[in-house]
UniProtKB/Swiss-Prot annotation:
Coiled coil: none
Record GO terms (molecular function): lipid binding; proton-transporting ATP synthase activity, rotational mechanism
InterPro entries: ATP_synth_csu_bac/chlpt, ATP_synth_F0_csu, ATP_synth_F0_csu_DDCD_BS, ATP_synth_F0_csu_sf, ATPase_proteolipid_c-like_dom, F/V-ATP_Csub_sf
Function recorded in the entry: F(1)F(0) ATP synthase produces ATP from ADP in the presence of a proton or sodium gradient. F-type ATPases consist of two structural domains, F(1) containing the extramembraneous catalytic core and F(0) containing the membrane proton channel, linked together by a central stalk and a peripheral stalk. During catalysis, ATP synthesis in the catalytic domain of F(1) is coupled via a rotary mechanism of the central stalk subunits to proton translocation.
TM spans (from-to): 4-24, 45-65
Keyword Cytoplasm: no
Pfam families linked to this entry: ATP-synt_C
Protein name: ATP synthase subunit c
Organism: Bacillus pumilus (strain SAFR-032)
Length: 70
């Protein structure tokens, strides 16, 4: 049962991060296409957003370790 819980935690964490990163990057590209002069600011905000979204799989791995070994 712990193995299933760990797999679900990692899988859903990766799924959420993948969808979130895709949305962030697509909206950034759309914004740069509309306003090329704002590209530098949008790119900076994109990297901050991607970093925040990537925290989710890291937290999911920690929860999976706790479920598996705890």
């Amino acid at each position: 049962m712990n193995l299933i819980a760990a797999a679900i935690a990692i899988g859903l964490g990766a799924l959420g991060a993948g969808i979130g990163n895709g949305l962030i990057v697509s909206k950034t590209v759309e914004g740069i296409a509309r306003q090329p002069e704002a590209g530098r600011e949008l790119r900076t905000l994109m990297f901050i957003g991607v970093a925040l979204v990537e925290a989710l799989p890291i937290i999911a791995v920690v929860i999976a370790f706790l479920a598996f070994f705890g």
